[in-house]
Amino acid sequence: MAVNVRDYIAENYGLFINGEFVKGSSDETIEVTNPATGETLSHITRAKDKDVDHAVKVAQEAFESWSLTSKSERAQMLRDIGDKLMAQKDKIAMIETLNNGKPIRETTAIDIPFAARHFHYFASVIETEEGTVNDIDKDTMSIVRHEPIGVVGAVVAWNFPMLLAAWKIAPAIAAGNTIVIQPSSSTPLSLLEVAKIFQEVLPKGVVNILTGKGSESGNAIFNHDGVDKLSFTGSTDVGYQVAEAAAKHLVPATLELGGKSANIILDDANLDLAVEGIQLGILFNQGEVCSAGSRLLVHEKIYDQLVPRLQEAFSNIKVGDPQDEATQMGSQTGKDQLDKIQSYIDAAKESDAQILAGGHRLTENGLDKGFFFEPTLIAVPDNHHKLAQEEIFGPVLTVIKVKDDQEAIDIANDSEYGLAGGVFSQNITRALNIAKAVRTGRIWINTYNQVPEGAPFGGYKKSGIGRETYKGALSNYQQVKNIYIDTSNALKGLY
């Protein structure tokens, strides 16, 4: 299936500052391509420090009035954004597919609708938020107010460009903040098109979108003195840099980083559910998911029964044209990611690991211009293996045999990460006990990779700081002010 790219995507994009697309301070641009075909989609402006400074100052000015708008006004604007996203769902989903390489069935059913739902959700959250009053005694009262922080500086990863942007923009502006946000330089196009919705709905300067390199303009956003709150989704290595910037400027930061999550299949699991859940855990979005269930821990009693079923399931996955509704897995997002995946396959071949399924780049039937990789299953002898410890970020699943629940817990916790995990069992008490013992921010039971609004998402350990996607995330973007009132009109007698 082929579409006319210009029906969806402009040939060039400027920076979105103060409600308008504007030229950058430099004439430098970055080429944006379709990873499935190599086709050039657009050229974006390469923002410089001067552009970051301009955007932050605009956001500061807009904050003065935006922070004073009523909650009901803000809620209505968020609902309008969500409604318009859904009205343009098919167009924005196609842009996401063209730019990211993920299947159209995913962008249409998940990425864009869930982004819209986050705007609707945080509209309701801000409308129903209430402060508190504590009558300390008959003469003194403590009032707790939740106030916006100011200007939010955010950078989001390339794997879910629009959805991750919604995770940050919706609560930030719901709370009364303004935001300067930068998408990945390789996948910026959906957010740039959605800027046209912001243009229609929001006052100027509330949302500002910069494009450029993370190491340049992204770093400048996080280190700007005018930014009051940092929010980042991406690798743990870059997360350290964002945390350092937050410490240097003494501002709060929300960090959603890497993972190496364990998906535990117990001997009493429903194997039909387990096989589907395993695929959801590692093949969804081509495995380019921070919460991917990339370590499969299988009870030894069912190992020989489950593994052949997985081999068959993996071999039947339709990998191909992301625009085809029948495609189940599309292209990896770029050559760097494909090369990284291949390096782990090479490491497996040079070790005592055993490749049970896949392990190859796909180039036949017109796939040679893209970055397609087979669903891959690799048995490793133990959790100390390189493939069991390092985040691959692709459709590569390592499988480890375990003898009992405690060994599964111990292996699951033997990781520097703690973002997510899964347990498959028909005994809910057994599953809950494991879920409570595994040190991660999210555990799915009898499913995987479900990310609805209303359920907190975030990690332990090196997987990050803070939680997103639920009502408590609003507090990430607020200051708490206490007003203490003494009505006694009496001297305290200390001086």
From Swiss-Prot:
Signal peptide: none annotated. Keywords: NAD, Oxidoreductase. It catalyses: an aldehyde + NAD(+) + H2O = a carboxylate + NADH + 2 H(+). The keyword Cytoplasm does not apply. PROSITE patterns: ALDEHYDE_DEHYDR_CYS, ALDEHYDE_DEHYDR_GLU. Pfam families: Aldedh. The active site is at residues 256, 290. It comes from the Bacteria. One of its GO terms (molecular function) is aldehyde dehydrogenase (NAD+) activity. Its EC number is 1.2.1.3. NAD(+) binds at residues 212-218. Belongs to the aldehyde dehydrogenase family. This is Putative aldehyde dehydrogenase AldA. It comes from Staphylococcus aureus (strain MW2). The lineage of its organism: Bacteria, Bacillati, Bacillota, Bacilli, Bacillales.
